[in-house]
């Protein structure tokens, strides 16, 4: 689930900031900007600061009156969103797909797993590890959802449908990192200590989705991300099958199925917002796309590579696990899913936002084609996750 948004493809898309819309509250607070350390100014990197700059952060941008919309949707969410959760007793668990340590055949099962993994290329493991690390940063994602005004879990055990969804979604997602982590541990193909360090760094750094405590922006972001993870895990499943590890293909495939179900829930929320507030919602979609959807693990660091996420995402792009084309395809899918082209009765700003969003995917594709044509072969980069081996970018 990776893509480099510092690439020429995305830098070339010029964006202009629109004037303050009805979506934004006049009461907006700016958090400080974290600057990366530099030799020139003598700064020393702080141990718990993100590996790269975090944008100037806007907070609480949703006008207070918009909160009433989410309060009014409690009954709808009960009947239409919580149905996309599975009862715990019907959910798969990581142990269903792993060698059973209580069985007499445990050692033989581990040997079989390691044998299957022997011929899988290192670059595939780089991408699989990156996906697993992204899943393991789950505490950050629950934290992010609980920053959203009007839908956060106010008590830690709130019984509003929004809070129930966030906790249960987190519980379902928790199985993904558990399963991939244990499979990779048993494979013997990766440096688990370096991976564990990367996870700790990532959770400590957090994420910067630029959702502004605004549930409009937050649910648009999660709609995009769940589809991105569905695509990414689906492609790692396909690659595992091609490399002959059918069990690993099953593992990645079952995770992809969860992501698809979660995508359905989040896209339904945004669909409902389009129904009750089309102008505010299309402005929010345009806002998120102007800012560009950053991947959840964009602050990834392993203690060695300051450009780890960029390198990981480049390998994912080369292998076709998650690409710039996928980014454009997701946008196009959501535009169709939410029927943005058919929106009527919009304000002047709403019309501009609709036209911008509907025309963006073709522009991204054209820019990516040009970037690929100009792309130069990059030197291989060592990845600590695979014991410092050089991996082609």
Curated annotation (Swiss-Prot):
Q: Tell me the keywords, alphabetical order.
A: Chloroplast, Fatty acid biosynthesis, Fatty acid metabolism, Iron, Lipid biosynthesis, Lipid metabolism, Metal-binding, Oxidoreductase, Plastid, Transit peptide
Q: Name one GO molecular function term.
A: metal ion binding
Q: What is its EC number?
A: 1.14.19.2
Q: Does the keyword rRNA-binding apply?
A: no
- BP GO terms, sorted: fatty acid biosynthetic process
Q: Please give the GO cellular component terms listed in this UniProt entry.
A: chloroplast stroma
Q: Which cofactor does it need?
A: Fe(2+)
Q: Which InterPro entries match?
A: Fatty_acid_desaturase-2, Ferritin-like_SF, RNR-like
Pathway entry: Lipid metabolism; fatty acid metabolism
| Residues binding Fe cation 1, per UniProt | 135, 173, 176, 259
CDD domains noted in UniProt: Acyl_ACP_Desat
The transit peptide spans 1-30
Report the locations given in the UniProt record: Plastid, Chloroplast; Plastid
**Is the keyword Chloroplast assigned to this protein?**
yes
Q: Which Gene3D superfamilies match?
A: Ribonucleotide Reductase, subunit A
Database matches in Pfam families = FA_desaturase_2
Give me the comment on cofactor binding. Binds 2 Fe(2+) ions per subunit.
Residue numbers binding Fe cation 2: 173, 226, 259, 262
Q: Which reaction does it catalyse?
A: octadecanoyl-[ACP] + 2 reduced [2Fe-2S]-[ferredoxin] + O2 + 2 H(+) = (9Z)-octadecenoyl-[ACP] + 2 oxidized [2Fe-2S]-[ferredoxin] + 2 H2O
Give the UniProt family note. Answer: Belongs to the fatty acid desaturase type 2 family.
Biological role? Converts stearoyl-ACP to oleoyl-ACP by introduction of a cis double bond between carbons 9 and 10 of the acyl chain.
Indicate the quaternary assembly.
Answer: Homodimer.
Identify this protein by name.
Stearoyl-[acyl-carrier-protein] 9-desaturase, chloroplastic
Query: What does the record give as the organism's lineage?
Result: Eukaryota, Viridiplantae, Streptophyta, Embryophyta, Tracheophyta
